[in-house]
Amino acid sequence: MKRETFGSRLGFILVSAGCAVGIGNVWKFPYMCGQFGGAAFILIYLVFLLIMGIPVMVCEFGVGRASRHSVAAAYETLEPKGTKWHITKWIGVIGCYFLMMFYTTVGGWMLYYCVRSFRGDFVGADMKTVSAGFSDMLGNMPLMAFWTILISIIGFGVCAFGIQKGIEKVSKFMMTALLLIMIVLAIHSVMMKGAGAGIRFYLIPDFKQMAEIGIGNVIFGAMSRAFFTLSIGIGAMLIFGSYMEKDQRLFGEAVNITVLDTIVALMAGFIIIPACFAYGIEPGAGPSLIFITIPNIFAQVAGGCVWGGLFFLFLSFAAFTTLVAVFENIISFDMDLFGWSRKKSTLVSLILIIILSMPCVMGFNVLAGFTPLGEGSTIMDLEDFIVSNNLLPLGSLGYVLFCTKKNGWGWNHFLEEINQGEGWKFPSGIKGYMSYGLPLLIIIIYLKGYYDKFQPMGTKVLVGWMIVAILFLTFVIGCSCGKSNAEKVDK
């Protein structure tokens, strides 16, 4: 069966950017930027995007375009016979499922709050009322299940139409609308009375604050955010590489996608931070920022139901473009592994994702007593930990090693593939960095993530979990150490 391709270069860029643009751009980046020193943090963040995020993305795109498969079959297609690289494909397969087990729930929240905002539910409400409304939603399992199932059905429905007629067409519209809505919201926010203090907090370099937090913490914060913002590591980008033509070099395409993702993150800050300062509300991070702080602000603004509705519409688009991208990856797994048709793969995957999403939904109500990562944690926290702290960095490490090691795809084959076509050429002189420096950075992010997560729980807990982290790391490195049959014969 002939491989589908994108209808246009713009379609590929917007679909891939839609996958990269996610909720973290909104509920994490602006707060981190203000907290870690404003413009100085942004500069460090951009450096790490260039030296770490973009190279990993190029690796994913390259493996996808060369193999013409999802991660479920990409390694088998390119690896030398006798090697074990294909075992690491399960990082991508499992990663996409685990990501959707909680991201569908979050997407459902966005859709529900979009409807509530346009309906005027928050007009005139105080902080206590808004906060109680969020708690009531979390405690209402049927309501949460409904919105989770609805957004899953819509997402898989789009994927059922294929790349050009479904995903590309919808993502073009949603990403364009998302950017336009963000521009309108940002202009409205920065023009609020008192917004200037927020803009200064957001952008002006505060080296004194950086020194108080610790330069090392600021650098690691920027490095981590740059790594996690691009949805790299679980094959979500690889699948779109497999639908690409060979008329464009992949380095330039990765830069374009990263620029779009960064624009969205920066604009989110212009929407949120000035508005918080204008109304004297402490800007925070995470779900409380989105579902309590922001509705409370729009409750006080003239025309708040419109502005609030637009805000949650843009968030719904951001969540939905990511959902559709990962759904396509999941559908492709079945098509590659079992030879199923797109229609059958879509239906089976939809049913499976709905079932797998229910533990996350129930983790806030029926299963609220289950705290897998310590007091106050939820099933969503566990699923997020599995994806963000494990599968994303381990999967990324696997791609980089595969593209640079002689017993993998190899540096020469990698360069030959990614430099086909027009556009910016990937520098061949950084082989040493790609082979040793970049893997080391990824390993540092991975182990530091474990340390930060479990260090507050005490030495015994920390040591136990660090052993687990090292075992997972050993698994990936072990898969990269096998010799090909050709090497064995030569020996």
Name each model feature, range by range.
Residues 11-48, 197, 235-241, 252-255, ...:
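Transmembrane helix-boundary motif of multi-pass solute transporters/channels
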Residues 2-6, 168, 172-320, 324, ...:
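Membrane-embedded translocation segments of transport machinery
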